[in-house]
Amino acid sequence: SFAKEDVAGLSLDEERERIERTFSGLAELTGTRPEGWFTLPRTGDDYPGGSVSEATGELLLEAGCGYFGNSMADDIPHYWITDYDRRHTLLMLPYYYAMDTQFFMFFPGVGKGSGLVQTRALWENWAAELEGVRAWGRQSTFVIQPYLMQFGAARAVLDRIMRAVTGDPDLWSATSGACAAYWKQAYPADRTLRFEKAAWLDEE
């Protein structure tokens, strides 16, 4: 998300502007408009799931977003019903912070109990996750923060995971966009979802 700010404190128009500024800025830099959206947590947050507001899902759809990249609800993609009455959905891809490099490099921040660099723990998590993915055929997202993975032990761990993933014929190494495209074709929302009011919601 733009500047990793907490969007829960923004107005609807402010959040809409931030989303468009992010998509447009990345399109200008790369020549391609992003297909999806990640609201990754900040290392100083008390919560690990990033920041969304009640309007985020609908605003992302309005901006042409094809998927939301960091949902911790499952280890397979699933659909977020952003507007029940209008049957609006946004595809959610798996994310878990134990697979995110930022929580193993100078986290918490220096002066806040930092564990400094925990590359061995990061590799143990990644290696165990690969075993689980092979065994059960699920999806896992490895989040690599390039600025944290440039040198020494961190670079060695990055090289190791890249070799492990790309060298295994039983694993499909794909971008989030490719994963989203596959899931939407194999399990389209209009054929796989059964819209029902949640039992715990009060009926008007």
Identify the role of each PLM range.
Residues 2-14, 106-111:
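Surface-exposed, active-site-proximal loop segments in enzymatic domains
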Residues 67, 73, 79, 120-204:
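C-terminal domain-boundary segment and adjacent tail
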Residues 1-3, 36, 137-143:
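Glycine-rich, often proline-containing surface loops adjacent to acidic residues and nearby aromatics
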Residues 89-128, 134:
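A conserved mid-domain beta-alpha-beta active-site/ligand-binding segment of alpha/beta enzyme cores
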Residues 6-95, 101, 149, 153-157:
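Catalytic domains of cell-wall/extracellular-matrix polysaccharide-remodeling enzymes
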Residues 7-11, 114, 118, 171:
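Pocket-edge positions in alpha/beta enzyme catalytic cores
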Residues 1, 41, 97, 146-148, ...:
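Short, flexible loop/turn elements at secondary-structure junctions
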